[in-house]
Amino acid sequence: MLKKAVGIVIRRVAYGDNHLIITFLNEAGVKVALMARNARKSTKYGSGLDLFYENLFIFSQFKGMGTLSSVDTINSHYEIREDIYVMTYAQYVVELIDRALEEDETNPYAYQLLKVALTHMERSDKARLIALLVSIKCMPLYGYVPNFKYSTYDGNMTHKDFIAYSFQFNSVVTQEALIEDPHAIPMTNKSLYMLYLLSEVPIESLSSINIEQSLIDEMETLVYKMYDEFIGVFIKSRKILEQMRRLDNYK
C-alpha cells in the first residue's frame, strides 16, 4: 500500500553503488527514512532528494525503512544554494533540528521551525540571525531552557540591570551575583535583552527584526557556549561555519 506525505529532506546517505537512504521530516514532525533504489544512477528523482527540498513523497512502508516510489517537488529552496554561507547556515539548522529529535518522536513544532527558517533564509539576508534564533528555539528540544527573563540569584526582573549570564545560576544576573559567581560571562545589557526578545518572539515574526552585527556576534558566542556546556551536541556544520569565519577574518 502506497503512502503520501509532505516533508523536507534533512539527511541523505549513499547506500552501496546505486542507492540512497534519505530521511525527511514530515508535517507531523516525524522523521521518515526511505530507501531510494538506483537513485545514484538514475534521473528518476531529479534533484528532489537533495537537502532542503520540500516534496510530496510517495512511498511504501510496512515496518522499519520504507521504499521511495516518487517525489513531487513543492519547494526546492534553490536560492539557499547560491551563497555558501547561507547554505552552510541552512545545513546547521537542518542538523540541529535533526539531532534534537529521536527517530520515533513526533514534534509538529520542529517541522514548522524548519520550514519557516528555510523560507526566511531563502528570502532575506539574515541567515546568521535565523540560525541564531533556531539555536535558541531548539534548546528546549534538547532538554535545556535558558533564562533571559530574570535573575535566579535575587529575583531581579529589571532588564537594564543585567550585565552577565551565569551558568551557575542558569540566568541573567546583576552586579551583585558576581560575588557568588565570578565566572559569569560578561555581556552587554543590550545583547541580553535581545536574547530575551528572541526567546519570546514567534519565529514567524523574524522578518521584522533587525539586529546589528556586533550584537549577533556576542549573542551567538554565548549561545554556542550554552550548547557546549549544557547540551553537548556536536554539530559538524557549526565547525565549518567557525572555520569559514576565521578564514574571512584572516584575509
Curated annotation (Swiss-Prot):
Highest taxon of source: Bacteria
Role:
Involved in DNA repair and RecF pathway recombination.
Report the gene name: recO
> One Pfam family of this protein, by short name?
RecO_C
**InterPro entries attached to this UniProt entry:** ARFGAP/RecO, DNA_rep/recomb_RecO_N, NA-bd_OB-fold, RecO, RecO_C
Among SUPFAM superfamilies, the record links this protein to: ArfGap/RecO-like zinc finger, Nucleic acid-binding proteins
Recorded protein name is DNA repair protein RecO
- PANTHER family, per the entry: DNA REPAIR PROTEIN RECO
Q: Which organism is it from?
A: Macrococcus caseolyticus (strain JCSC5402) (Macrococcoides caseolyticum)
Q: Which family does it belong to?
A: Belongs to the RecO family.
